[in-house]
Amino acid sequence: MHEYSIVQSMLDLIEENAKKHNAMKVEKVVVKIGVMSGVEAHLLKIAFDTFKEGTLCSDAELEMIIQPIIAKCRACKKESRFEKNEIFYECKHCGDVDLEIVDGEDMILMQLDMN
């Protein structure tokens, strides 16, 4: 389960940011998880709740924003939104299959609420 190593790296990054801003406590962590990132949200939550103990995040709430796939069509230049379970991706505007994924592949630390 690679979510454990992801959470450990995330907690290190959070602690680094908290120290940089002289924060004593993190109250909320917001992450955006792309559906193609390979990160399972429920496993990330379990890992976060396990590893946050004894850190500045010990009382922090984890908010997860699940990001669908957004692809830009190279033919018509419009963006289309897809769910992970779609088997075939084609532009929802013109039907072309020459698409560039522009969102939905990453996990990003979006926001920290600190005191």
From Swiss-Prot:
GO MF entries: nickel cation binding; zinc ion binding
Gene Ontology biological process terms, A to Z: protein maturation; protein modification process
InterPro entries, alphabetized: Hydgase_Ni_incorp_HypA/HybF_CS, HypA/HybF
Keywords: Metal-binding, Nickel, Zinc
Pfam families registered for this protein in UniProt: HypA (PF01155)
Source organism superkingdom: Bacteria
Residues given in the record as Zn(2+) binding sites: 73, 76, 91, 94
Binding site for Ni(2+): 2
NCBIfam families: hypA (TIGR00100)
The family this protein is said to belong to: Belongs to the HypA/HybF family.
Function: Involved in the maturation of [NiFe] hydrogenases. Required for nickel insertion into the metal center of the hydrogenase.
The protein, known as: Hydrogenase maturation factor HypA
Organism annotation: Nitratiruptor sp. (strain SB155-2)
Taxonomic path: Bacteria, Pseudomonadati, Campylobacterota, Epsilonproteobacteria, Nautiliales
